[in-house]
Structures are given as C-alpha cells and as structure tokens.
Amino acid sequence: MKKVLVTGGTGLVGKALEAVIKEQSPEDEQWFFAGSKDADLTNLAATQALFAREKPTHVIHLAAMVGGLFHNMNNNLDFLRNNLLINDNVLQTAHEQGCVKVVSCLSTCIFPDKTSYPIDETMVHNGPPHPSNYGYSYAKRLIDVQNHAYHDKYGRVYTSVIPCNIFGPHDNYNPEVSHVIPGMIYRMHQLVTEKTDVPENDKVFTVFGSGMPLRQFVYSRDLAELMIWVLRNYESVEPIILSADEVQEVTIFEVAQAVAKAFNFNGRLVCDTSKSDGQYKKTASNAKLRSFLPDYAFTDLETAINASVKWYIENYDQARK
C-alpha cells in the first residue's frame, strides 16, 4: 500500500489533486493532504513530526512561499530563505524516513532570463533567472540539484515537475500576492459587483503592463492528473515540463479578454504601461511529456477560465483573498 503525503495540500494544486484522487478512488494508495496547520515546514522538527505521524512512502511536494510578480520583486530574500528551508527539510526528512519517491513542483520562472526558445528541461541551469524573482527561482532550482545529489549518493528517485502558469479553483485571489489570472478574476469581480451605479459600458478594467507578454497556462485539474501520472509512472530524476502545447500560448491581454467574457463584462479594457511586464515570454517545450503521453488533451483556456470564474463566484465567501 502506497502512502502519499502531499505538502501544500490545501492550496490550488493540492485541492485539484484531492478532487482527482477522490474520483479515482485508488485501492492501493492512501493520500494525506497536509496544509500549513499540520506542520510549519520551515521548521525541521515540525517537518519530522509530520513524516513520523503519516509515515509516507511517496511525497508530492507542493509547499512553498509563493506570490505574483510584484510580491516577488519586493521580497526576494524572504522567498529565497523560506523556500530553501522548506525544500531542504522535506527532502532530507523524506530520505531519513525511507520515502521511495518524491515529486517536487518547480516553475518555468526558474529558467534563464536570457535564453533561446522554446525552453526545455536541459536548460534549467544555463544562466541566471529573471531578476524580478531570483530568490524564488534559485530556491526552486536547488531542488533539482538536491534530487541529483540524493540519487548520486543514495540512489533515490526524487524528481521534479516544471509546470507553466497554473490557475483554477481554490487559487489565491489576494491582490497583494496573486498570480495573473486569479488577480484579474478578483479585480473584475470587484468592478462588476461593487460599482453598480456606473453603467457597465462606462466601466474600465485595467490590465497591468502592456498586455503583450506571452504565457502558457495549465488548468490545475490537468496538472493534477499529470502529476499523478508522474508519481506512478515517471522513473527519472531529471525534471519534466508539464505545460500546455506551444500553440496554446496567449498574451496577457488575451487572458484579460477571456476573463471579461467569463464575467459577461461589456466595458473597456485598457493597459497600464507604467506597470512592469516581467519576462516577455517563457515559452516551454513539452516534447518530453508528449513522448510519454502524446494524446493527453489539455483543457482549453476559455473553458478553464469559465470554470474558475464560476467557482470564484459560487465560493466567494471562503475564497482566499
């Protein structure tokens, strides 16, 4: 019987994993979704206590200090130190407790700022990351370094996945820390519901930055399905990119249009070019993933945004904001 511990299990991806596992009801696996209330993973003793209590054979490591572009830009040291602590505590404790496999979640932001496109798994360490979020990026890169070190010294199959921009139900909508899609959903909902005295055609929704940067997005449920596949079937320490196909890349302005459509918003969209764009593009190749799963069908962006907006409206009172 596998015992799977999910760190960061109450967040965006953890909730998606929980939903998929509930539907699958695997008879040979027990899953425990740990949140911050279960253990402070920056504390080694607390991490060890969690592992001793749950006795996992496998770990999906999602726990991290995370945030959007502007939160990262202002707090690089905190992102570096907290994530280094979390990752080292989880990986070392997993090893000490004899965990067979750990799948850690990285991010496409770890790739070099100056690079050729599309980026792939071989390019992680080819140069410094974008300066806007170097603290988070270097901490995440070191997971890959540690995975190789545990394999070299102990033969551990501790690996990592690199998703593109994740979104979906149970996201963090707090405007101070949110990523682009939940941030837009939060602000669009405010605009639509709180300014009822203003005719909708006169309302203006502001897109931060030029709207031109290109991004690939992955719906949290799709990522959950793929991470479960990695846990059960992918037997390499080398990272694997879990990203939608390159042809599904869209501009930030197109994302804003999709969010507006989901809210039936008929006002204007304007770009505030005084705000930073971050990296212009981060196009990732999913060729390795496609070599294993050539027929996997990603949820299209409009369908996924519609579902995310619907969840936010229906769960507004308990949504993280």
Swiss-Prot record:
Give site residues, Lowers pKa of active site Tyr.
Answer: 140
List the Gene Ontology MF annotations in alphabetical order: GDP-L-fucose synthase activity; GDP-mannose 3,5-epimerase activity
In the Enzyme Commission scheme, what number(s) does this protein have?
1.1.1.271
GO terms (BP aspect): 'de novo' GDP-L-fucose biosynthetic process
Concerning CDD domains, the annotation shows: GDP_FS_SDR_e
According to UniProt, the name of this protein is Probable GDP-L-fucose synthase
Q: Which Pfam families match?
A: Epimerase
Q: Which family does it belong to?
A: Belongs to the NAD(P)-dependent epimerase/dehydratase family. Fucose synthase subfamily.
* UniProt function note: Catalyzes the two-step NADP-dependent conversion of GDP-4-dehydro-6-deoxy-D-mannose to GDP-fucose, involving an epimerase and a reductase reaction.
Q: Which residues bind substrate?
A: 187, 215, 277
HAMAP family linked to this entry: GDP_fucose_synth
Q: Which GO terms describe its cellular component?
A: cytosol
Assembly and binders: Homodimer.
Q: Which reaction does it catalyse?
A: GDP-beta-L-fucose + NADP(+) = GDP-4-dehydro-alpha-D-rhamnose + NADPH + H(+)
Q: Which organism is it from?
A: Drosophila melanogaster
Active site (catalytic residues):
136 (proton donor/acceptor)
The site (Important for catalytic activity) lies at 107, 109
What are the transmembrane regions?
Answer: none
- Pathway(s) where this gene product acts: Nucleotide-sugar biosynthesis; GDP-L-fucose biosynthesis via de novo pathway; GDP-L-fucose from GDP-alpha-D-mannose: step 2/2
Q: Which UniProt keywords apply?
A: Isomerase, Multifunctional enzyme, NADP, Oxidoreductase
Per UniProt, the enzyme's principal EC class comes to oxidoreductase
Where NADP(+) is bound, by residue? 8-14, 140, 163-166, 179
